[in-house]
């Protein structure tokens, strides 16, 4: 063996700038309107945007949900109608019917093309209707649909209160950490004070990223076990409970697609970003907590045993996927984190397609992926940015992979060609963060493999056309 062969292989990056499929970022409304309970989302776009939202979330239309579509008409585009007056009419109606704490305007491709000055209109209208208006350009010019959330959170980061601002005591209590209130529910004041003393003395820490409430509670409790207090989450359950973010605060992201929010917090609010792998899978969650502990100068405890216990509980799933290969076509920017976890589970991954890669924000995750490949003794995956789907299909045939994680556009065509697929969008909506939710990831990944094994056992994988006897 030569010295060159002994050197560890590095990650191979490539950019194809090809045609790939993903949803439109305005789909972020689907989960954000449920997360921020006192909000109202107004999507300003054409009928096409309306059809997309109606198809994606049509079941909820009849429940009068807290989102709506402001359809641009010929008069808007030809500048015959006054944008301000039209938006004022709609926002007054929203205030009258729903009275939200915040209205979020979602800009679309059309508002970009006709140069509608939403940022200029919002402050005027806000002072008139006395409701905060947040403007987010979550349009189809982004790389992936999850970046819609990134745009909204970056806009909301500007609305987070500063600690230096003069705030009345009653307002402070109201704005207090909702998670802390939930965890302390039903406890006596003495117990709460005793619990507060369990925390280490460290700089304030704020998390950013929209997660379901049970997952937020789980991650907050995991950090609490290490003596780390989470001062707040962006977004909060209510707009009125946005966390205080001041200069020198530490911030940590929970999703790989939030690079714009991270940049806003660092540049505008002078926060310090904790660059950690993301808490997806037991390995990622442990690395995430350890990195936060090291930055805040806290000694982590019990994480190795916690991770080992989770891996032991996953053994029934690991037996199904160990030694198999997975191919990511690229859709939601979760690909690198999921690939790292699945490689740790014993799979191989020849290629990770990803619509957009921010190497600075995902730097820790990429290093962790490299280390995982070295530890597991498997080849490094090729990371293809902006992949060309036609070329990817050829490479899927070449590698003869066992599973392809793909967008909905390619799932059925690949299945028809005898290739096992899993919709990548399911990982966006499933609870995949933290120690305990690793089982949910493996449930999704193994489902197509288990289904096809069951069909083979039943003898349904071969359809025989019998001669019709007339």
UniProtKB/Swiss-Prot annotation:
The EC code for this enzyme is: 1.3.7.7
Pathway assignment: Porphyrin-containing compound metabolism; chlorophyll biosynthesis (light-independent)
The cofactors required by this protein are: [4Fe-4S] cluster
As one GO molecular function, the record gives: oxidoreductase activity, acting on iron-sulfur proteins as donors
Which GO BP terms apply? light-independent chlorophyll biosynthetic process; photosynthesis, dark reaction
Q: Which Pfam families match?
A: Oxidored_nitro (PF00148)
Q: Any binding details for the cofactor?
A: Binds 1 [4Fe-4S] cluster per heterodimer. The cluster is bound at the heterodimer interface by residues from both subunits.
Catalyses:
chlorophyllide a + oxidized 2[4Fe-4S]-[ferredoxin] + 2 ADP + 2 phosphate = protochlorophyllide a + reduced 2[4Fe-4S]-[ferredoxin] + 2 ATP + 2 H2O
Q: Kindly list the positions annotated as binding [4Fe-4S] cluster.
A: 24, 49, 109
**Top-level taxon:** Bacteria
State the UniProt keywords alphabetically.
4Fe-4S, ATP-binding, Chlorophyll biosynthesis, Iron, Iron-sulfur, Metal-binding, Nucleotide-binding, Oxidoreductase, Photosynthesis
What SUPFAM superfamilies is this protein classified in? Helical backbone' metal receptor
Quaternary structure (record): Protochlorophyllide reductase is composed of three subunits; ChlL, ChlN and ChlB. Forms a heterotetramer of two ChlB and two ChlN subunits.
- Biological role stated in the UniProt entry: Component of the dark-operative protochlorophyllide reductase (DPOR) that uses Mg-ATP and reduced ferredoxin to reduce ring D of protochlorophyllide (Pchlide) to form chlorophyllide a (Chlide). This reaction is light-independent. The NB-protein (ChlN-ChlB) is the catalytic component of the complex.
Record's family? Answer: Belongs to the BchN/ChlN family.
- The identity of this protein, by name, is Light-independent protochlorophyllide reductase subunit N
- Protein's organism: Acaryochloris marina (strain MBIC 11017)
